[in-house]
Amino acid sequence: LAQRAGITIDAKGAQLNQREQELRDRIRACNREAARYFFRSLTQDDAGGVGRAYLLNERGLSMAAVRHFGLGYAKPESFGLVNYLRDKGFTDDEMITANLAYQSKTGHVMDRFRDRIMYPIFDTVGNVIAFGGRALNKEDKAKYINTNTTPVFRKSNNLYGYNFARKAHSDHLILAEGYMDVIALQTAGFAGAVASLGTSLTE
């Protein structure tokens, strides 16, 4: 058809675009499995007791809210998520590209999020594209660790909670400060509550 129409197709470019799309699909799938792992760690594992205590007792959330927002817990293990994702068929490179793992100086691929409450970040259609992780250990120097730029996520282009606001057909948005503020507002009936993920917003 292209020949008949006199159109030249860039085969290399098409192959590159296909590889990029396949990588994005794999990163989204990797994030989805990671979210399941974090959620089960929070709601079912004994190790998740500290996370449940923080969310349910200290912050006053209900289990319904935990489920709705897909909250989770990253256990204080070095290889828990890495081993889980390997068992699910994901490669070390995919985990590192998704910013879920990193390679240590000794060459080991290790979990990036440890002993943290995990807030999955969704795109507008509900795909998990990133995470925010809040430290539970008060001595941890980094209170929050967030996913860096990946093939599926750029923090300045996304809003936390926007997928839920969009699904609720909210006709206006309320810009809140952080994850828990969005959860509290939306749970209280303010469906348009969202939070920025960077220091500035794009148009």
Would you name each region that the model predicts?
Residues G70-G72:
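Aromatic-rich juxtamembrane segments at the membrane interface
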